[in-house]
Swiss-Prot record:
The keyword Acetylation does not apply. Its EC number is 2.7.4.16. Pathway: Cofactor biosynthesis; thiamine diphosphate biosynthesis; thiamine diphosphate from thiamine phosphate: step 1/1. The gene is thiL. Mg(2+) 4 binds at residues 30, 45, 75. The keyword Metal-binding applies. This is Thiamine-monophosphate kinase. Reaction mechanism of ThiL seems to utilize a direct, inline transfer of the gamma-phosphate of ATP to TMP rather than a phosphorylated enzyme intermediate. The lineage of its organism: Bacteria, Pseudomonadati, Pseudomonadota, Gammaproteobacteria, Enterobacterales. Mg(2+) 3 binds at residues 30, 75, 212. It is an enzyme of class 2 (transferase). Mg(2+) 1 binds at residues 46-47, 122. Pfam families: AIRS, AIRS_C.
Length: 323
């Protein structure tokens, strides 16, 4: 069964949540009205996901809904923001009720998990794409930024790198593994990334600079270095790569995935040495799991990769939306 724009909004996206105390007006008027709490900054991020470019054509609506929200949440995590509101715009070839029901159910499930309220959006006809704008609050003025890294800072990564790329390679049938359990694990890492919201909030009073790894470590760390006017030395022997990857793939494969492939949605951040004790407290409390991979240097030294105490040549890569 097909629906028009207003029927889609009414049936699948309106009145699924209670308004929060700062939401004056949500879906149903020309604009949403929200009140920003005193002494808070509002962080805003927008992402568009296009079929065939950002997600595979055979992705289920359930997985698409989850991932579209998760990748936006990751941007808030990189700023140290607490998720609050979201808008959704869907462009789709036809208003398939079965597809919409599955999508909206998964969509509200992740929204409720992270206490996000849908406050508006749009629907249109055309090739499948999802556009989300997400809003988060930051108490005080301690937002995490890309441009605050300092010479001498230590560089850390949360979690492990490369598993999402391995999962995508399996989905695209570029890579094959006999172990079904491992295949399913890696595919899930690609389809259902975990945004590091609590880690980002905890890092507000610890880190100098941060970014989420959406386009690959080399590419995204490069944004920190460019914005901070710094260089970096990275020890490849300390890059956090899971035993699943090291046991099942060649070193060239998993190192390339870890360095150049995106969609891990882990956080890369820098801290001054004086804040190591604060970070260790967060690690001990299991708020953050992270690995030190190098340190910030002066801009003229550039970005250097060190392996077994030797500088190696590498190709700067990463995901590019216009290739």
């Amino acid at each position: 069964m097909e629906y028009n724009e207003f029927e889609i909004i009414s049936k699948f996206f309106k009145n699924h949540q209670k308004k929060d105390k700062n939401q004056i007006k949500g879906i149903g008027d020309d604009s949403a009205l929200i009140k920003i709490p005193k002494n808070n900054l509002l962080a805003i991020s927008t992402d568009t996901l296009v079929e065939g470019k950002h997600f595979l054509k055979n992705i289920t609506p359930k997985d698409l809904a989850y991932k579209s929200v998760a990748v936006n949440l990751s941007d808030l995590a990189a700023m140290g923001a607490k998720p609050t509101w979201i808008t959704l715009s869907i462009t789709m070839p036809k208003s398939d009720s079965v597809w919409l029901k599955s999508f909206s159910k998964s969509f509200f499930k992740i929204l409720n998990k992270y206490k996000l309220n849908l406050i508006g959006g749009d629907t249109n006809s055309g090739p499948l794409s999802i556009t989300l704008s997400i809003y988060g609050l930051i108490e005080g003025k301690n937002a995490l930024l890309r441009g605050n890294a300092k010479n001498g800072d230590l560089i850390y990564i949360t979690g492990n790198l490369g598993e999402s790329a391995a999962g995508l390679s399996l989905l695209q049938k570029k890579t094959f593994l006999k172990n079904v359990k491992i295949c399913n694990y890696l595919i899930k890492k690609h389809l259902k990334p975990i945004p590091r919201i609590s880690e980002g909030i905890a890092l507000r009073n610890i880190a100098n600079a941060a970014i989420d790894i959406s386009d690959g470590l080399i590419s995204d760390l490069g944004h920190i270095l460019k914005n901070s006017k710094c260089g970096a030395d990275i020890n490849l022997n300390t890059i956090p790569i899971s035993k699943i990857l090291t046991d099942n793939f060649k070193i060239d494969e998993y190192l390339n995935w870890a360095l150049n492939s995106g969609e891990d949605y882990e956080l890369c951040f820098t801290i001054s040495k004086k804040n190591i004790k604060k970070l260790n407290v967060a690690i001990k409390k299991k708020i953050i799991k992270c690995t030190c991979i190098g340190y910030i240097t002066s801009a003229e030294k550039g970005l250097n990769l060190i392996q077994n105490q030797k500088k190696i040549i590498f190709k700067k890569s990463g995901f590019n939306h216009f290739i």
